[in-house]
Amino acid sequence: MTENIHKHRILILDFGSQYTQLVARRVRELGVYCELWAWDVTEAQIRDFNPSGIILSGGPESTTEENSPRAPQYVFEAGVPVFGVCYGMQTMAMQLGGHVEGSNEREFGYAQVEVLTDSALVRGIEDSLTADGKPLLDVWMSHGDKVTAIPSDFVTVASTESCPFAIMANEEKRFYGVQFHPEVTHTRQGMRMLERFVRDICQCEALWTPAKIIDDAVARIREQVGDDKVILGLSGGVDSSVTAMLLHRAIGKNLTCVFVDNGLLRLNEAEQVMDMFGDHFGLNIVHVPAEDRFLSALAGENDPEAKRKIIGRVFVEVFDEEALKLEDVKWLAQGTIYPDVIESAASATGKAHVIKSHHNVGGLPKEMKMGLVEPLKELFKDEVRKIGLELGLPYDMLYRHPFPGPGLGVRVLGEVKKEYCDLLRRADAIFIEELRKADLYDKVSQAFTVFLPVRSVGVMGDGRKYDWVVSLRAVETIDFMTAHWAHLPYDFLGRVSNRIINEVNGISRVVYDISGKPPATIEWE
């Protein structure tokens, strides 16, 4: 019998802040399970979830507007601690009898709050002291409205010159509000405040750890599928790889992985996937060489979105054909992770701002009545990686840079041809190898090479040549929503360029992309 790792749980109500998923990740980092729900949940849903505590997130709306979101009244009647962050504090104050006003002055960026009153939330937590010995906290503010009167049964815990109620508390009811964002690293003691709330005030045990998550997932897979057979599309990416390892641990040879080699992978990637999962870990893998099929389907197509659709469609066709060859498979496994679940829920309700449509393996043949197994669907990406390490997958594989689902299909601009893919693979491998050698790979968030379908004149020896151009791209980002181009050293870029032009016959020029996001996207297509 595995331990119930969901026993203590925090409910986070999302009012639309860009940082809300970060709040959830911070709570998970503290070893406590949490879920992220839209703000307008019902009393019955909250009762059913039975949280140990509730966090009200920040959000872009103004509580002074008539139809702005409000926390369900039951939040304040459930008898559990409540922590309001930024907008969450404002709606708490307003709903419990305080007052909020719009302000002409937005407070955005660093601020120092002075702790005036002892509180369980910040006791013993400080960044520095005032001349008369009062604790000061360095925090990150991002708000326009502010609380101008707190509810009568609350006390002011901390303030700044422009924000008289930076922290408010009702210690008896264990209700706390902060006008800043404790979840961002700029609030230096933010993690300690969250820990104080989650672990001490809500009294949650740290049961959410990689080893226990694995035990729980294995037990749940066995309970769900029993002795049935399961099929998984293994791409070699982080999510499908960790899914494969979890399923293999749970059901062994009853798992069949289908690895579709579409000819759009990185250099030697197909061989590496087969060696690692087949030979080293002993998984049951069907290797489907399908390069010709993908490239002929892509022939003549220049439009990026059309290329994505073609690659997706052909993948599903190939996967379906392989699935039909297997006898008695009852379950399809997918590497869906928690942000995918949040995005789909948001697109279904229209509440959050969906950035992209997410595609996992879809469109199985109608004659295949299969159940769905999604062992990662409660996990954030950083948690998936930690679990992968615990399961024995190599660090370099788990922490390598993102690679798009359509692969080189969207890194070869315009029409995709085998010749272009082969040149790009070799150029990209040199760039990545040099980044690793220079200890720069982990210092950038993503780096790759793009094939440009234009020829340029070059000189090699005594002769002229007329060959292709590639662009190097490297960015630094925290969340991939915005990004800066990476300021790689000139001598490093020169070395990479020299190697590519000398070692990859067919490329005569290398350029470096210095566009930020926005206005450019990270990928070119």
Swiss-Prot record:
Show the HAMAP family listed in the entry: GMP_synthase
Which reactions are catalysed by this chain?
XMP + L-glutamine + ATP + H2O = GMP + L-glutamate + AMP + diphosphate + 2 H(+)
Instruction: Look at the named UniProt entry and state the broad enzyme category this protein falls under.
Output: ligase
Pathway info: Purine metabolism; GMP biosynthesis; GMP from XMP (L-Gln route): step 1/1
- Which positions in this protein are listed as binding ATP? 235-241
> What are the record keywords, sorted?
ATP-binding, Glutamine amidotransferase, GMP biosynthesis, Ligase, Nucleotide-binding, Purine biosynthesis
Is Ligase one of the keywords UniProt gives this record? yes
State the organism of origin: Salmonella heidelberg (strain SL476)
Write one Gene Ontology MF term: GMP synthase activity
Q: What is this protein called?
A: GMP synthase [glutamine-hydrolyzing]
Please state the Enzyme Commission number of this protein. 6.3.5.2
Q: Which residue numbers delimit the Glutamine amidotransferase type-1 domain?
A: 9-207
One Gene Ontology CC term in the entry: cytosol
What the entry lists under NCBIfam families is as follows: guaA_Cterm (TIGR00884), guaA_Nterm (TIGR00888), PRK00074.1 (NF000848)
Residues forming the catalytic site: 86 (nucleophile), 181, 183
SUPFAM superfamilies for the chain: Adenine nucleotide alpha hydrolases-like, Class I glutamine amidotransferase-like, GMP synthetase C-terminal dimerisation domain
Residues forming the GMPS ATP-PPase domain are 208-400
Subunit field text: Homodimer.
Q: Which InterPro entries match?
A: Class_I_gatase-like, GATASE, GMP_synth_C, GMP_synth_GATase, GMP_synthase, GMPS_ATP_PPase_dom, NAD/GMP_synthase, Rossmann-like_a/b/a_fold
What job does this protein perform? Catalyzes the synthesis of GMP from XMP.
